[in-house]
Curated annotation (Swiss-Prot):
Belongs to the V-ATPase proteolipid subunit family. GO terms for molecular function: ATP hydrolysis activity; proton-transporting ATPase activity, rotational mechanism. This is V-type proton ATPase subunit c. V-ATPase is a heteromultimeric enzyme composed of a peripheral catalytic V1 complex (components A to H) attached to an integral membrane V0 proton pore complex (components: a, c, c', c'', d, e, f and VOA1). The decameric c-ring forms the proton-conducting pore, and is composed of eight proteolipid subunits c, one subunit c' and one subunit c''. InterPro entries: ATPase_proteolipid_c-like_dom, ATPase_proteolipid_csu, ATPase_proteolipid_su_C_euk, F/V-ATP_Csub_sf. The keyword Transmembrane helix applies. Its main location: membrane. One of its GO terms (cellular component) is endoplasmic reticulum. Residues 1-9, 76-91, 152-161 are lumenal. It is a multi-pass membrane protein. The gene is vma3. It comes from Schizosaccharomyces pombe (strain 972 / ATCC 24843) (Fission yeast). SUPFAM superfamilies: F1F0 ATP synthase subunit C.
Length: 161
């Protein structure tokens, strides 16, 4: 039964939030992995002994996709055939917040990781600075995860259809 508060299209927004969370976060993780991986490959030609040590940017980029996966699973757990428009919009906002924050974080991790591993091959003291900058880039994705989790907890508060 469709009402003004619970139209038939309301679950669509929840599904789009679920999709946005995993798709955008995965795009960011893929870009970060690819960009940092190219830097590691180029650096590995001259300094193959540093390859394992410099895989940290690739690992950090992969963590961004996990943020999107967590929110996607949480949103999909709350999806129902009859859903309020409020819940659908909240779920869309949660998915977009973690997805777009993950996209930005993945771009930052990829660019910093690429330049960082290339620089570390020339000057090993740059490694600590690279790690610090990568942590700040990773936190951007974590902010999106926190906002998405807070939004998702509000999606089912006192909502009736």
């Amino acid at each position: 039964m469709s009402t003004d508060l619970c139209p038939v299209y309301a679950p669509f927004f929840g599904v789009m939030g679920c999709t946005a969370a995993i798709v955008f976060a995965s795009f960011g993780a893929a870009y970060g992995t690819a960009k940092a991986g190219v830097g590691i490959s180029a650096m590995g030609v001259l300094r193959p002994d540093l390859i394992v040590k410099n895989t940290i940017p690739v690992v950090m980029a992969g963590i961004i996709a996990i943020y999107g996966l967590v929110v996607s699973v949480l949103i999909s757990g709350n999806l129902k055939q009859i859903l309020s428009l409020y819940s659908g919009f909240i779920q869309l906002g949660a998915g977009l917040s973690v997805g777009l924050a993950g996209l930005a974080a993945g771009f930052a991790i990829g660019i910093v990781g690429d330049a960082g591993v290339r620089g570390t091959a020339q000057q090993p003291r740059l490694f600590v600075a690279m790690i610090l900058i990568l942590i700040f880039a990773e936190v951007l994705g974590l902010y999106g995860l926190i906002v998405a989790l807070l939004l998702n907890t509000r999606a089912t508060d006192n909502v009736t259809c």
